[in-house]
Amino acid sequence: MYDVTIVGCGVVGASLAYTLSQYRLRVLVLERENDVAMGTTKANSAIVHAGYDPENGTLMAKLNVRGSELMEQLCSDLSVGYKRIGSFVLAFDEEQKKHLEHLLENGVRNGVPGLRILDAEEAREMEPNLAENVVAALYAPSAAIIDPWGLCIAEAE
């Protein structure tokens, strides 16, 4: 007899199982594949988003920045690969540059640390392989990448 049955052991199922394992519960995880992370999780981009996209005031906006912080700690606790590499959103014309300003304002309201707009020269100093027609970039230094398979395995174990 189990207290909780979790169907699927991708990143959501494994995370749920890991969290529930911290309580006095008997947890059963059912997975149709022969290993964890064989569904949608295996095809994800492994990006831990900074939090400038969600519209301010939404649940996603409220949780995104805090979730990013917690993911770094979780990966450290479980010895899972985590690397803060930052991210760019590129603008190729003035209209797109205005959108970067909207994302910057949104990100600041959401509490994203270190977010800023770079001109083309500053962006190329950081990433010399950018296209020649880039006019600006939104830089989010808190964006990161993880090992999603390693995370699922560590949480499932």
Write out the residue ranges for each language-model feature.
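Short, glycine/charged-enriched secondary-structure capping and boundary segments
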Residues: L20, K42-S45, K62, L103-E105, ...
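N-terminal Rossmann-like FAD-binding beta1-loop-alpha1 element of flavoenzymes
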Residues: Y2-V29
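Helical element adjacent to the flavin cofactor pocket in flavoenzyme catalytic cores
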Residues: L138-E157
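Short beta-to-alpha linker loops that shape the active-site pocket of alpha/beta-hydrolase fold enzymes
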Residues: E33-D35, A123, E155
